[in-house]
Regions:
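C-terminal His-loop and adjacent cap/lid subdomain of alpha/beta-hydrolase
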Residues: 1-251
């Protein structure tokens, strides 16, 4: 299935806590706490968010998401991409100066996060000054709601700030689309096949703003869904549940 209204989903993993004996269908308190910490993202000791939170979506049960955040080690040895690729990236590319001997368990978000400030200008794409770009420019931004590396909430907050800073008319130049279930760029239990190139071409050359983009996917044969410009989401109207024509984009 799909979680279209992802911001309306307030799932609490605490509901999975074992009532008594640990079984394969419940989680211990320590596991629930770890899951909450993972989805909340890194924070300082006083609770200030550094990045995140991540949203709960259907794709988190897939191999892509698990491979990034949890891994598949049966011995306790770290083998997730966060613990391997992520550690190398942080140690050599993000920190100033580089720290090849970095122990991630000793990383202090109160003390050490500031060590990334020099590279942030090259890696952070969070500018909201887009009024000059909006003068005849067009941009489509899209993100999978099960993206194992990018937090959708951070992207939606950026877009909200873009609208606040530049005014509602900026939506005539920049639109954001979220794809339920899609992992990083593609994959996942999603309708992850769509043509953004045609959408941006039609917008630039013919003045046709992308009010909805039709998507399909190998994970759901015979199913199509509309991708809606944020903050709108696809809502069922009537008719065939497998057809995009049965859905409207609304808040």
């Amino acid at each position: 299935g799909f979680i279209n209204d992802w911001q309306g989903c307030d799932f609490d993993p605490g509901i999975l806590t074992c009532k008594s004996v640990k079984t394969g269908t419940c989680l211990t308190k320590a596991q629930v706490d770890a899951l909450r910490d993972m989805f909340n993202g890194p924070r300082t000791s006083d609770g200030k968010s550094i990045y995140g939170p991540f949203n709960y979506d259907t794709g988190i049960g897939g191999s892509e998401w698990r491979g990034m955040h949890i891994g598949s080690s049966g011995t306790g040895k770290w083998d997730s991409a966060d613990a391997t690729l992520g550690l190398v990236n942080l140690s050599y590319l993000q920190l100033t100066p580089p720290d090849p001997d970095l122990d991630p368990l000793e990383f202090d978000f109160d003390r050490d996060a500031v060590r990334t400030r020099h590279t942030a200008a090259n890696t952070d794409a969070d500018s909201t000054f887009l009024s000059t770009f909006a003068d005849h420019g067009k941009m489509i931004v899209y993100n999978g709601l099960s993206d194992q590396g990018m937090a959708s909430g951070v992207l939606s907050a950026w877009y909200d700030e873009v609208v606040k800073v530049n005014g509602p008319a900026i939506r005539d130049s920049i639109r954001l689309f979220f794809i339920p279930g899609m992992c990083h760029c593609s994959g996942g239990k999603a309708t992850d096949q769509f043509n953004m190139l045609d959408a941006i071409t039609g917008w630039v050359e013919n003045g046709k703003a992308p009010d909805r983009i039709i998507a399909t996917g190998k994970a759901f044969p015979g199913v199509s869904r509309p991708l809606c410009p944020y903050p709108l989401v696809a809502r069922y109207k009537d008719g065939d549940v497998n057809s995009a024509d049965s859905f409207v984009c609304s808040k």
